[in-house]
């Protein structure tokens, strides 16, 4: 154990090697099984499994947790967008289409008026929905996604797959200009490390939240707040080192709070296309501190990690337009892109120790991810009637070191 660098990397340092060196020097009897297995192991095998010995994947899992919580929040955000654009009520796109069809032929023939954009006035054009009295809605969305946290610099990558369902109800007030709603979601995430790191984990999430939309003559203001309970079940093994291959299991829980605020200006072109510059788009998420214990095996770890905080601030653009079908249905395609800068944590860290010698601590860190975050969405809403709507969305997210792509299917009913 003279070469402590054998057990280290750039992200976590050589703390594991120093801890093992101290245990060997002190002849810690409780560590004899681990020290003996490592002493007779091949150096190349030790180098390959150093990240698994440190428990780096537990730190990477914390980044995957933020992706899980963010996926649920994205479902709520997409529902709000679909409702505003004509999903569960006569939204802005439908109003814009009505405005465009009402324009005179002479006005439409002028090049300037064809290209000029004017403000949408939801309050003036939204009387049909109010007159119909349909101001309460129930909705449901199923969602699934696959993502990856890239490996590098001695940290193994982590793949994560998410699936779940979200339910909600909302009501419209103030002549349909204000929407208040609540949401409930349940989701499962399965994770597996790459590059032979021998780690897998399952996370169950239960999420509850509330949201509000406020339309005004020049655009809208949207906000949402959510609480998420997270329950983890992880399994770790040290491959290729005799005596350390038994699976190590840990179960632990923590939670997250998240919030989103978004403002947009609304414009419409002469042909009914609604253009909405988004400024600002602010996302906040905080996952609470956590700790785990893998039992009493020779390589079992105990670990603690502080809270992880994400603060994203940025801007974007979204477009949508409503088309009338041959059978009276309304179809509203949507597109959205948002750029944000991460002002919070871009790396997760644990302070770990072996269960046999918990006072000998070392660091385990995830791979750092980028500060520039790009998200996008392509979706369509089909309204078969004034009461029933169906939504389909493709969503994606990209930053240095992390990607995610997903699909959402939704159903809304207004009464």
Language-model features: locations:
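Primarily extracellular Gram-negative trimeric autotransporter adhesin
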Residues: 1-7, 106-111, 117-127, 344-355
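Charged, amphipathic alpha-helical linkers/stalks
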Residues: 1-43
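Outer membrane beta-barrel translocator domains of Type V secretion systems
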Residues: 37-271, 391-415
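Extended hydrophobic secondary-structure segments that form protein cores and membrane-embedded regions
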Residues: 138-139, 182-185, 277-282, 333-338
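Conserved small-residue
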Residues: 140, 212, 277-278, 333, ...
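Extracellular/periplasm-exposed beta-strand and loop segments of Gram-negative cell-envelope proteins
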Residues: 147, 156-158, 189-202, 230-257, ...
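Solvent-exposed flexible segments
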Residues: 263, 274-289
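Outer membrane beta-barrel transmembrane domains
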Residues: 269, 297-415
């Amino acid at each position: 154990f003279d070469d402590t660098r054998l057990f280290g990397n750039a992200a976590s340092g050589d703390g594991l090697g120093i801890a093992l060196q101290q245990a060997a020097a002190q002849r810690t009897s409780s560590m004899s099984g681990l020290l003996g297995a490592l002493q007779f192991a091949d150096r190349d095998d030790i180098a390959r499994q150093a990240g698994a010995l440190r428990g780096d994947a537990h730190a990477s899992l914390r980044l995957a947790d933020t992706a899980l919580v963010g996926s649920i929040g994205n479902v709520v955000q997409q529902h709000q967008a679909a409702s505003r654009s004509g999903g569960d009520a006569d939204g802005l796109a439908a109003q814009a289409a009505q405005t465009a069809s009402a324009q005179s032929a002479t006005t439409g023939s002028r090049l300037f008026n064809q290209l000029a954009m004017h403000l949408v006035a939801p309050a003036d054009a939204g009387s049909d929905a109010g007159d119909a009295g349909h101001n309460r809605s129930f909705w449901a969305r199923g969602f699934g996604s696959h993502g990856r946290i890239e490996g590098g610099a001695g940290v193994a990558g982590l793949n994560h797959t998410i699936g779940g369902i979200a339910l909600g109800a909302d009501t419209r007030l103030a002549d349909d200009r204000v929407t208040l709603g609540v949401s409930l979601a349940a989701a499962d995430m399965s994770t597996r490390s790459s590059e032979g790191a021998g780690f897998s984990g399952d996370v169950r999430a239960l999420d509850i939240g509330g949201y509000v939309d406020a339309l005004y003559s020049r655009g809208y203001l949207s906000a949402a707040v959510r609480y998420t309970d997270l329950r983890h079940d992880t399994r770790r093994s040290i491959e290729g080192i005799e005596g350390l291959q038994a699976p190590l299991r840990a179960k632990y829980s923590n939670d997250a709070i998240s919030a989103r605020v978004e403002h947009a200006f609304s414009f419409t072109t002469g042909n009914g296309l609604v253009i909405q510059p988004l400024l600002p788009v602010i996302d906040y998420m905080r996952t609470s501190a956590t700790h785990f214990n893998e039992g009493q095996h020779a390589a079992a770890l105990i670990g603690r990690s502080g809270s992880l905080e994400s603060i994203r601030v940025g801007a974007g653009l979204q477009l949508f337009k409503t088309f009338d079908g041959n059978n009276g249905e309304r179809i509203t395609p949507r597109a959205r892109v948002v750029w944000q800068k991460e002002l919070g944590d871009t790396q997760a860290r644990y302070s770990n120790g072996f269960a046999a010698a918990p006072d000998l601590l070392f660091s385990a860190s995830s791979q750092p991810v980028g500060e520039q975050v790009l998200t996008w969405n392509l979706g369509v809403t089909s309204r078969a009637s004034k009461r029933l709507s169906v939504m389909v969305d493709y969503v994606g997210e990209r930053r240095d070191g992390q990607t995610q792509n997903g699909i959402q299917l939704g159903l809304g009913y207004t009464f």
